[in-house]
Amino acid sequence: MVWQTHKVAAFSSNAFDLAEWVSLHPTVRAESPALFTPMLLRLPLILLAGIMALGSSVLQTEKAKWIWRGVALLVVLRLNAPTDFYPWGGGSPNDQQLGRLTAFGLAAVFVIILGGRWLRFFWKPATLILLLASLITALEGYHRAQKVLHSIQIETKLGGGLVLYVGFLIIPMLFILLMSGLMKQKERASFPDALS
């Protein structure tokens, strides 16, 4: 779904396309670190894959765990750089960023998969941190991209994709916080003397 809309269809784009568009602008290429705005727009995919891999650690059946882990890996591979990038180091700075993010995402998902048994004990706070990081990077990336587009007089409007993405992140955050609060209330009700 589109994160921004414009009367010209070429300027209506999702986060991935928006990252590609703004990466062409000289001020974005000169950012420190390089291509920071496109990275902020691409990083939510990596964080989403991390959330999925982390969520797989609390699933009951092995089949469900491996399905979620596989989907997490596919989400990361969505960022894969063009074949011109390989072997490592070739291509444009944009392709280099895609390659690095893909490598980082794959490494992160594999670490989460390997640490699955231990991660299930603190998956709620870890998931909240990843959800919040994804929300912040998506909104900051969108804001910075809009500033770039406005500087070259391309006026765009907020698209439904960004609204849905933000809602997609906020709902599980609220659910985890609500469930944690209910569990604490249940503990207090079960052991009222032990907690005072």
Predicted regions and their residues:
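Compact integral membrane and secretory-pathway proteins
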Residues: M1-S196
